[in-house]
């Protein structure tokens, strides 16, 4: 097999759910959500190159990939709609913890879609449609930055970026299944306040720390902290840092603490500003 010496580097950025609620369960088995999503500068790094063998996906990584391989799923999804006359080799350096709610696997898939989009001249609009076929977080992570996300994740409204905030992460060494998390919640736990995501965004822009704390919400947090003492311990540790707000991202297990002027990671603009 001939492998090109030429590769492109893609960064797959982690995401935070600054707000996350479930509005209803859909007939197709998915859930309608509403959320305020934000990328931070923690990222996986992918070296992606074309290989001659059509349809082959080769992945080399520093850790074992668990569950569905979203990198391969991204490639197969593009194959269904486009004439992809090559395979790909991906060297993946994982920095985003798996099963943490930080969207690492989805962001890796989005990085592969961006690569294929350039090679096959696929528009961003069409990439977003393909991304929705791959996974619920993938459309947002094609672009990243700051966005209101609705539907099952396919409806993304990109917003002017929230800037000048930093965040620390407190990630217990447990992995939470998204499928399991959705099985644990029920309609009585839904906040059903779809306007709160936009109100929270406005509070971040105004740097209104009291409103940020009051409006921040994750529908999974109460259930997951009661189910997993390690997540509650991480939340307690984060709150001792006196942040603007500390909360869980996604369905867990990672806790983030938002700070005004300190913290290891920072909020970033869309991914195209950081390639």
From Swiss-Prot:
The gene is ispE. The keyword Transferase applies. The keyword Lipoprotein does not apply. InterPro entries: GHMP_kinase_C_dom (IPR013750), GHMP_kinase_C_sf (IPR036554), GHMP_kinase_N_dom (IPR006204), IspE (IPR004424), Ribosomal_Su5_D2-typ_SF (IPR020568), Ribsml_uS5_D2-typ_fold_subgr (IPR014721). Pfam families: GHMP_kinases_C (PF08544), GHMP_kinases_N (PF00288). Transmembrane segments: none annotated. SUPFAM superfamilies: GHMP Kinase, C-terminal domain (SSF55060), Ribosomal protein S5 domain 2-like (SSF54211). Keywords: ATP-binding, Isoprene biosynthesis, Kinase, Nucleotide-binding, Transferase. GO terms for biological process: isopentenyl diphosphate biosynthetic process, methylerythritol 4-phosphate pathway; terpenoid biosynthetic process. Catalyzes the phosphorylation of the position 2 hydroxy group of 4-diphosphocytidyl-2C-methyl-D-erythritol. It comes from Pseudothermotoga lettingae (strain ATCC BAA-301 / DSM 14385 / NBRC 107922 / TMO) (Thermotoga lettingae). This is 4-diphosphocytidyl-2-C-methyl-D-erythritol kinase.
């Amino acid at each position: 097999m001939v492998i090109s010496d030429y590769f492109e580097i893609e960064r797959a950025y982690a995401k935070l759910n600054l707000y996350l609620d479930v509005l209803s369960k859909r007939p197709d088995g998915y859930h309608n959500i509403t959320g305020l999503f934000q990328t931070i500068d923690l990222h996986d790094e992918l070296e992606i190159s074309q290989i001659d063998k059509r349809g082959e996906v080769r992945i080399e990584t520093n850790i074992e990939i668990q569950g569905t391989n979203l990198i391969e799923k991204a490639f197969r999804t593009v194959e269904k709609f486009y004439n992809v006359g090559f395979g790909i080799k991906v060297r993946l350096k994982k920095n985003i913890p798996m099963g943490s709610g930080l969207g690492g696997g989805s962001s890796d898939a989005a990085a592969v879609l961006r690569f294929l989009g350039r090679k096959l001249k696929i528009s961003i609009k069409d990439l977003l449609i393909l991304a929705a076929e791959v996974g619920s977080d993938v459309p947002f992570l094609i672009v990243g930055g700051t966005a209101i996300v609705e539907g099952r994740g396919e409806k993304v409204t990109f917003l002017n970026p929230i800037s000048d905030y930093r965040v620390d992460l407190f990630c217990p060494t447990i992995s939470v299944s998204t499928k399991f998390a959705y099985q644990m919640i029920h309609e009585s736990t839904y906040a059903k306040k779809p306007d709160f995501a936009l109100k929270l965004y406005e509070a971040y822009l105004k740097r209104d720390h009291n409103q940020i704390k009051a409006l921040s919400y994750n529908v999974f947090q109460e259930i997951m902290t009661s189910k997993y003492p390690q997540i509650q311990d991480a939340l307690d540790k984060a709150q001792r840092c006196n942040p603007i707000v500390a909360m869980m991202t996604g369905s867990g297990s990672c806790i983030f603490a938002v700070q005004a002027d300190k913290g290891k990671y920072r909020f970033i603009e869309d991914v195209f500003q950081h390639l």
